[in-house]
Swiss-Prot record:
Tissue expression profile of the protein: Detected in epithelial and stromal cells in benign prostate hyperplasia tissue (at protein level).
PTM-bearing positions, type N6-acetyllysine: K125
Lineage per the UniProt record: Eukaryota, Metazoa, Chordata, Craniata, Vertebrata
Organism domain of life: Eukaryota
The protein's name in its UniProt record: Protein BUD31 homolog
Record's subunit section: Identified in the spliceosome C complex. May interact with AR.
Protein's gene: BUD31
Length: 144
């Protein structure tokens, strides 16, 4: 994967508070990308990458929207630099999508019947004891 070019502009105030966590998640992402995939299905090798991407984006989202711990300028800097996924955050702000795992799970064009992923089905509508696992990202149910 090519190295992402970061802007030459200095980060806004407050960056030094969130930088260690983002660096730690970047390190986890690099480990997940280089992890051997022998013995796994093709789709299973991408699941850790999706989880870390979700974790990074949720971290930025919670800091800005829930805890109000970072400024709008720093939030926009994180989105512009690729630390958070703005499309996923836009979905999290909508009712019913607060716990969405990834954007692939709501794209209907990727399925045979034009429906959402199995992880978007509420647990109350599934059979009791049935364990589900999303083929896209490995989610076990993000609809509630």
């Amino acid at each position: 994967m090519p190295k992402v070019k970061r802007s030459r502009k200095a980060p806004p105030d407050g960056w030094e508070l969130i930088e260690p966590t983002l660096d730690e998640l970047d390190q986890k992402m690099r480990e997940a990308e280089t992890e051997p995939h022998e013995g796994k299905r093709k789709v299973e090798s991408l699941w850790p990458i999706f989880r870390i991407h979700h974790q990074k984006t949720r971290y930025i989202f919670d800091l800005f929207y829930k805890r109000k711990a970072i400024s709008r300028e720093l939030y926009e800097y994180c989105i512009k630099e690729g630390y958070a996924d703005k499309n996923l955050i836009a979905k999290w702000k909508k009712q019913g999508y607060e716990n969405l795992c990834c954007l692939r799970c709501i794209q209907t064009r990727d399925t045979n019947f034009g429906t959402n992923c199995i992880c978007r089905v509420p647990k109350s509508k599934l059979e009791v004891g049935r364990i589900i696992e999303c083929t896209h990202c490995g989610c076990r149910g993000c609809s509630g």
